[in-house]
Amino acid sequence: MNGTEGPFFYVPMLNTTGIVRSPYDYPQYYLVNPAAYAALGAYMFLLILLGFPINFLTLYVTIEHKKLRTPLNYILLNLAVANLFMVFGGFTTTMYTSMHGYFVLGRLGCNLEGFFATLGGEIGLWSLVVLAIERWMVVCKPISNFRFGENHAIMGLAFTWIMACACAVPPLVGWSRYIPEGMQCSCGVDYYTRAEGFNNESFVVYMFICHFLIPMAVVFFCYGRLLCAVKEAAAAQQESETTQRAEREVTRMVVIMVVAFLICWLPYAGVAWWIFTHQGSEFGPVFMTIPAFFAKSSSIYNPLIYICMNKQFRHCMITTLCCGKNPFEEEEGASTTSKTEASSVSSSSVSPA
């Protein structure tokens, strides 16, 4: 083993010189330069500074504008709530602990931070899955005479929370555990050890299959079918430049959504799986910290992609920020009207919202 395992922690450094200490009690500056902890704290502050306004504004604008409170937008509000969980339950904690250079909040704080960060991340993950399924159902109509309504939206929300809890709760009750990871300033699921009595092996396999491979397969399938439907509609109206433009726009948005999903989850899942399958191999603290950056930054770019790219949400946000008047209203309105009239598969139907 190329690390030091202790009660409820694993430090990725052999204690050959006796300098390794518990990440709950002592600064971990022997792992990386103290400047790296300052950089981590600054990064967390940036995520809070950007993530809170974007996601809070999403909720506020929806409350203010009744036309946004439609079943198809429920999942976007769920995504904003998930991101706020990450901001308050994860980012603020990591910023505070990185300022001290170790997980100063102790074992209980590690459980709470790990739980809320995992819960928020998983709600966000399954919200993207439900979002893809909803768009596929609305556009491709795999079920004839199906009309998406409020009950379906509520079922989708309940599903995201059930799946998120199915991932975040088990480490609190003995199936795996939360321990400090990376630079030892944030907590996550124990991929690092085979600690007796925690069944880490089965939990990691369960997470990798049920909370990464299956969601990724569903997202790829739904957006793949959606793209096929849009291209078929565009092929049937080849003479319409507006339809072709709408098809290109939808393709661009789908590619962005899929790439963002992969950027968010593939590095973290890949590194976690490598650590799990190569236990005892040597790796540095930054090896797990950097992929976590990609997953955490989703609280910023997911709202930008799934909410701010939606014309209706964007219009209402600008109206709210500009005290009730949208200076771009005429331009956006003309564009939307033209596209809606000319295309049988409007890009707004398959846009992020």
From Swiss-Prot:
Alphabetical GO biological process terms: absorption of visible light; G protein-coupled opsin signaling pathway; visual perception
Residues flagged as site, Plays an important role in the conformation switch to the active conformation: 113
Pfam families (alphabetical): 7tm_1, Rhodopsin_N
List of residues that carry N6-(retinylidene)lysine: 296
Residue positions the entry lists as glycosylated: 2, 15, 200
S-S bridge residues: 110-187
GO MF annotation terms: 11-cis retinal binding; G protein-coupled photoreceptor activity
Transmembrane segments: 37-61, 74-96, 111-133, 153-173, 203-224, 253-274, 287-308
Chain ranges on the Extracellular side, renumbered to this chain: 1-36, 97-110, 174-202, 275-286
Annotated segments matching region Disordered: 330-353
Alphabetically ordered keywords of this record: Cell projection, Chromophore, Disulfide bond, G-protein coupled receptor, Glycoprotein, Lipoprotein, Membrane, Palmitate, Phosphoprotein, Photoreceptor protein, Receptor, Retinal protein, Sensory transduction, Transducer, Transmembrane, Transmembrane helix, Vision
Membrane-side (Cytoplasmic) residue stretches: 62-73, 134-152, 225-252, 309-353
Phosphoprotein found in the keyword field: yes
Membrane topology: Multi-pass membrane protein
PROSITE patterns in UniProt: G_PROTEIN_RECEP_F1_1 (PS00237), G_PROTEIN_RECEP_F1_2 (PS50262), OPSIN (PS00238)
Compartments in which it is found: Membrane; Cell projection, Cilium, Photoreceptor outer segment
Domain of life according to the entry: Eukaryota
Any one Gene Ontology cellular component term annotated for this protein: plasma membrane
Biased composition annotated in UniProt, kind: Low complexity: 334-353
Tagged with keyword DNA repair: no
Name the record gives this protein: Rhodopsin
Originating organism: Tetraodon nigroviridis
Lineage start: Eukaryota, Metazoa, Chordata, Craniata, Vertebrata
Gene coding for it: rho
